Design a protein with these regions (language model features):
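Short, conserved, GDST-rich strand-edge loop motifs in beta-rich repeat architectures
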Residues: 64-84, 171-204, 256
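Beta-rich catalytic cores
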Residues: 50, 85, 108-110, 127, ...
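Conserved beta-propeller blade signature
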Residues: 9-11, 61-63, 120-123, 165-168, ...
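Surface loop/turn motifs at the tips and blade-to-blade linkers of beta-strand repeat domains
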Residues: 31-37, 41-47, 102-107, 147-151, ...
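Asp-box/WD-like beta-propeller blade repeats and closely related beta-sheet repeat scaffolds
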Residues: 13-78, 86
Length: 277
């Protein structure tokens, strides 16, 4: 995940390293690679293992997801097989230089986007097949609500659309066999012990999908590559000047799709910070 702040610094989540900043003059700086340790954790979980996606609040606070505290980036299928909440949402405050965990026990938290009220974030739980909303300011501070649940696939990054709604990448589609396996911990344990990892039950990552949704959890439109010919396993997308750009962690290409009726002048972080208006 990447996001620009008001001063055009680019903040980047790097799996296995933490949160970094790239200044306009291309200087790379480490922002943080740790958070507060869980109070009752036997293992020291203060180090960031898999920083994933981020967005920046109006006051400069950076909210970012850590998909799992137990596994490294290449081991994400193992986290999925374990099927429990190993992830967390973390906040870095540049005013104080401190980092702390705001939510934990999440099922592979992934995409993050500041909501329209400026007081909450929308975030995806990939293995929870859901989109949730967390309030960090205002009268609902600390509350979490479900925006969309029981999605047909596994949600990844979330980004703002030019019409004020949101784009969501679906990294893969669910299957009845894997859904059943997630309700059978004994079966998953035997599979993990006896079957090579490349033969495990796995999400259908041969389908590409992006959906647009609103804050009421309504799906407004969707785009599909059902056979995964051009863009399977879409993990990120960004609307920019009337086009939707598509990327995937295992893809060797960037896709571009013309959006009918989209704002041809829309640049996400220019609008976010009120530039060129």
């Amino acid at each position: 995940g990447m996001a620009f702040d008001r001063a055009d610094n680019l903040y980047v989540c790097i799996g296995g390293m933490g949160l970094y900043r790239i200044t306009p003059d291309r200087k790379v700086e480490k922002v943080t690679d740790e958070t507060n340790r869980s109070l009752y954790s036997v293992n020291d979980d203060s180090r960031l293992r898999l920083a994933d996606d981020l967005d920046i609040a109006d006051d400069g606070r950076i909210f970012f997801s850590e998909a799992t505290v137990r596994y490294e980036m290449h081991e994400w299928p193992v986290d999925g097989l374990e099927a429990r909440g190993n992830g967390r949402i973390i906040c870095y405050n540049p005013a104080t230089g401190t980092t702390h965990t705001v939510l934990r026990g999440l099922k592979f938290p992934n995409g993050i986007c500041i909501a329209s009220d400026g007081q909450s974030i929308l975030f995806a739980e990939t293995f929870g097949c859901s989109i949730k909303r967390y309030w960090f300011d205002g009268p609902k501070t600390g509350k979490v609500e479900t925006v969309m649940d029981n999605l047909p696939g596994y949600p990844d990054n979330i980004n703002l659309a030019s019409d004020g709604n949101y784009w969501l990448a679906m990294v893969g589609m669910r299957s009845p066999a894997l859904d059943l396996a997630w309700r059978m911990p004994g079966f998953r344990k035997r599979m993990g012990k006896r079957v090579p990892i490349d033969e495990w039950l796995f999400p259908n990552i041969n389908t590409g999908c992006v959906i647009k949704f609103n804050e009421r959890g309504e799906v407004l439109e969707s785009f599909w590559d059902l056979q995964g010919v051009n863009h399977p396993m879409i993990t990120s997308m960004r609307e920019h000047r009337g086009y939707l750009y598509l990327g995937g962690i295992s893809n060797n290409r960037i896709g571009r799709y013309k959006l009918d009726g989209a704002d041809p002048n829309f640049i996400q972080y220019d609008r976010r910070w009120g530039k060129n208006q």
